[in-house]
Amino acid sequence: MLPDIGGTELLVIAAVALIVVGPKDLPVLLRKLGQFIGKIRGMANEFRASFDEMARQSELDELRKEVQAMRDGQYTAPMRDAAAQAGDASHVDQVFADIDASLNSGAVKVSPFEAYQAPALEAPEPTVEIVSKPARKPPAKKAAAKPAAKAELVSKPKASAKASKGDLSVPTKPARKRAAKASTNSDITS
């Protein structure tokens, strides 16, 4: 609405208008003020429309002049000027000759891998060290100990199986009893 006037400023203006004009005549004044602002906006829109129409007519006049000049053959288009410059064969030939010379000189490589020259690195000579393997120890007598260990393993699961059979019955909590709900119908009559 009004970008420079804030909300508090509008309240101050409304309070002053209420005091000066009075509560009886304030609605009539605001209605007339709204009609006046509407008329001003209408005039501004009409002026803008007429200005735009004149601009369109001037552009159309320029286009009409260009069309008439083309019909008469007096129109020099920018394309004709560009064609005249491109018609200079010596300049075009010179550009192509420069391009061919740079390609043939070897300064430009077709493949980027050919253009890259990696610096040559000297590889250090490999050093050979002879390492002796440690001697193996003879295997200890584990064969006699293994059957005894297996016997213990076999006996242990049997003992644990007996213990687990007795543990199968896990004590459980007794089922929880639910309290009876109070009836919604009242037995009391008044």
UniProtKB/Swiss-Prot annotation:
In terms of InterPro entries, this protein maps to: TatA/B/E, TatB
Keyword check for Cell inner membrane, yes or no.
yes
User: Which GO cellular component terms are attached?
Assistant: TAT protein transport complex
Q: Which residues cross the membrane?
A: 2-22
Q: Does the keyword Membrane apply?
A: yes
Output the Gene Ontology terms for molecular function.
protein transmembrane transporter activity
Q: Where is the composition biased (Basic residues)?
A: 134-144
Q: Name one GO biological process term.
A: protein transport by the Tat complex
Topological category with respect to the lipid bilayer: Single-pass membrane protein
Q: Note down the stretches annotated as region Disordered.
A: 130-190
Q: Where is the composition biased (Low complexity)?
A: 145-163
Record keywords, A-Z? Cell inner membrane, Cell membrane, Membrane, Protein transport, Translocation, Transmembrane, Transmembrane helix, Transport
Q: Which domain of life is it from?
A: Bacteria
How does this protein assemble?
The Tat system comprises two distinct complexes: a TatABC complex, containing multiple copies of TatA, TatB and TatC subunits, and a separate TatA complex, containing only TatA subunits. Substrates initially bind to the TatABC complex, which probably triggers association of the separate TatA complex to form the active translocon.
User: Which family does this protein fall into?
Assistant: Belongs to the TatB family.
Its annotated function is as follows:
Part of the twin-arginine translocation (Tat) system that transports large folded proteins containing a characteristic twin-arginine motif in their signal peptide across membranes. Together with TatC, TatB is part of a receptor directly interacting with Tat signal peptides. TatB may form an oligomeric binding site that transiently accommodates folded Tat precursor proteins before their translocation.
**Full protein name:** Sec-independent protein translocase protein TatB
Tell me the organism.
Answer: Caulobacter sp. (strain K31)
The lineage, from the top, is: Bacteria, Pseudomonadati, Pseudomonadota, Alphaproteobacteria, Caulobacterales
Gene that this polypeptide is encoded by: tatB
